[in-house]
Design a protein with these regions (language model features):
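Double-stranded beta-helix
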Residues: 1-14, 107-116
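A short glycine-rich, His/Asp/Glu-containing loop-to-beta-strand
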Residues: 17-61, 67
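A short hydrophobic beta-strand segment most commonly corresponding to one strand
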Residues: 44-45, 95-97, 110-116
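Glycine- and acidic-residue-biased ligand/ion/polar-headgroup-sensing regions
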Residues: 58-59, 64-84
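Residue-level recognition of conserved beta-strand positions in structured domain cores
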Residues: 46, 82-84, 108
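Short, surface-exposed secondary-structure boundary micro-motifs
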Residues: 101-102, 107
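Short acidic-glycine-tyrosine-enriched beta hairpin
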Residues: 84-101
Length: 116
């Protein structure tokens, strides 16, 4: 039985702060309020490209310290490689979902790339 108190968070695009952080200097991020709504159990951001791709400018091999991860391409595309999946190009409307810490590398992206 859950001990969480009911909470609702509305994240509007207008007035949202976009921040630059983390492993990907080519993206800026918008926090969707999921961590606030779930007392830190779930997180979620939107990332969008802020500069043109340059060779070698993707995200090097890494893992995410999480039990579940979802990548949904909202706009554009990116070329990526996941252990167990291989190298793929993921396009607008495509989704990758996985559990655990799967090694991955993000190789290339479009100028209009936007991802949740």
């Amino acid at each position: 039985m859950s001990t969480l108190k009911p909470k609702i968070v509305l994240s509007r695009l207008d007035g949202t702060d976009w921040t630059r952080k983390g492993l990907r200097p080519f993206l800026e991020y918008r926090d969707l309020g999921l961590a606030e709504a779930t007392e830190g159990r779930v997180g979620g951001t939107i990332g969008r490209a802020i500069k043109k791709f340059e060779p070698g400018g993707g995200a090097p091999r890494h893992t995410h310290n999480t039990s579940f991860h979802l990548i949904f391409v909202m706009r554009g595309w990116f070329r990526t490689e996941f252990e167990g999946l291989g190298e793929v190009t993921v396009r607008q409307g495509d989704c990758i979902a996985y559990q655990g810490q799967i090694p991955q590398e993000h190789i290339e992206y479009s100028d209009d790339f936007e991802v949740m």
